[in-house]
Each structure stands twice: as C-alpha cells, then as structure tokens.
C-alpha cells in the first residue's frame, strides 16, 4: 500500500485527514444512494470532530491507531476506483500515444502548411520561452530556500504582473488568492 510508505514523514494532522478521506471513499462504495451516503458521512464527520481539539498527543495517536484499525476491518472489499486514478482501468492508458512536442520541429514544411494558425502560435510560444527562460529560472531559484524545499509546497506559479511560466504545470502550484 503506497499510502503507508510515507507514513513516518507525515504529521498527525495529515494522517488524520488522509484517513478521513479514505474512509469517505470507502463509505461511498458501501452506500450507493446519495442520501444514505450523506447521512453516514455526517455521522463519520461528527466522530472525527469529537476529538478534533485533543491536546494530549499520546491519546490522539492512540485514537488514530484505533481509527485505522476500525477502517481496516470496515473497508469495502472492492472499492470504487476512478478510471484515471492509480489502479483504475484507464490509468496511464493513453500516455504511450502522446507525442513529445519536439517531434513537431521535424515536420515537413508542407505538413506545417496544413495547420498555419497552430504553427504560427507555436512559434510565438517558442520565442517567448527562449526570451523568458532565464528570468523564470531565476525567479524559481529566488523563491526556493538555499537548502532546497523544506516541505512539499512548491513556489507559486508566478509573481503579480508576470507572464505565466512555461514550466508551471510541472513544478509549481497555483498562485495564492487572498480570501
């Protein structure tokens, strides 16, 4: 089980949140009628909220252990897994058919002429990437602590007024929005 591998490195709060989410997902598999599911989800939420402000960490850890054992005995034998999730029927199914972007550079000009708008826009993006790459790398280095990231949180996607980085979908999270 993948979620147990990172267990020692998670905070107590993260463990509780992940247990709660797993329990809700398995409850969804047990209760197919939405109203019945909602009723039992509210009961489960009340059980979690009952011990939300527990100050004694020994007791909180014991409660978490008991809750994980209860989850183990009550989990659904065949839980619903979303098709594109790991373990789902379509997980990474079409990744083998995705062609890397650099392959488009090798297209013959007659092939590129069939899609003039796309390739004109693509050339603009390539030019923008060449012009802004150094600035984007500098921004990423400025926002990352010297010893590397200390948490899983990544730097924001961009600063106010900057163009969106071209690598945002790989290494960043969305920029914070004030509440």
UniProtKB/Swiss-Prot annotation:
Q: Which InterPro entries match?
A: Complex1_LYR_dom (IPR008011), Complex1_LYR_NDUFB9_LYRM3 (IPR045292), NDUFB9 (IPR033034)
Q: Positions modified as N-acetylalanine? A: 2
The entry's protein name is NADH dehydrogenase [ubiquinone] 1 beta subcomplex subunit 9
- Any one Pfam family match given in the protein's UniProt record, by short name: Complex1_LYR
Q: How does it assemble?
A: Mammalian complex I is composed of 45 different subunits.
Which protein family is named in the record? Belongs to the complex I LYR family.
Assigned keywords, A-Z: Acetylation, Disease variant, Electron transport, Membrane, Mitochondrion, Mitochondrion inner membrane, Phosphoprotein, Primary mitochondrial disease, Respiratory chain, Transport
Bridged cysteine pairs (disulfide): none
Q: Which organism is it from?
A: Homo sapiens (Human)
Q: Where in the cell is it found?
A: Mitochondrion inner membrane
Q: Which disease is it linked to?
A: Mitochondrial complex I deficiency, nuclear type 24: A form of mitochondrial complex I deficiency, the most common biochemical signature of mitochondrial disorders, a group of highly heterogeneous conditions characterized by defective oxidative phosphorylation, which collectively affects 1 in 5-10000 live births. Clinical disorders have variable severity, ranging from lethal neonatal disease to adult-onset neurodegenerative disorders.
Topology relative to the membrane, per the entry? Peripheral membrane protein
Q: Name one GO molecular function term.
A: NADH dehydrogenase (ubiquinone) activity
Q: Name one GO cellular component term.
A: respiratory chain complex I
Q: What does this protein do?
A: Accessory subunit of the mitochondrial membrane respiratory chain NADH dehydrogenase (Complex I), that is believed to be not involved in catalysis. Complex I functions in the transfer of electrons from NADH to the respiratory chain. The immediate electron acceptor for the enzyme is believed to be ubiquinone.
- Transmembrane portions of the chain: none
């Amino acid at each position: 089980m993948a979620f147990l591998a990172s267990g020692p490195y998670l905070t107590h709060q993260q463990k509780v949140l992940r247990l709660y989410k797993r329990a809700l997902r398995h409850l969804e598999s047990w209760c197919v009628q939405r109203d019945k599911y909602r009723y039992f989800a509210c009961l489960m939420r009340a059980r979690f909220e009952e011990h939300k402000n527990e100050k004694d960490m020994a007791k909180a850890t014991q409660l978490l252990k008991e809750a994980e054992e209860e989850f183990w005995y009550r989990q659904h034998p065949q839980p619903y897994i979303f098709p594109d999730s790991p373990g789902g029927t379509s997980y990474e199914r079409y990744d083998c058919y995705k062609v890397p972007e650099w392959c488009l550079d090798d297209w013959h000009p007659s092939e590129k002429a069939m899609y003039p708008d796309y390739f004109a826009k693509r050339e603009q993006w390539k030019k923008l990437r060449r012009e802004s790459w150094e600035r984007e790398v500098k921004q990423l280095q400025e926002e990352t602590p010297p010893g590397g990231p200390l948490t899983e949180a990544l730097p924001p996607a961009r600063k106010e007024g900057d163009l969106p980085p071209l690598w945002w979908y790989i290494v960043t999270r969305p920029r914070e929005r004030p509440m």
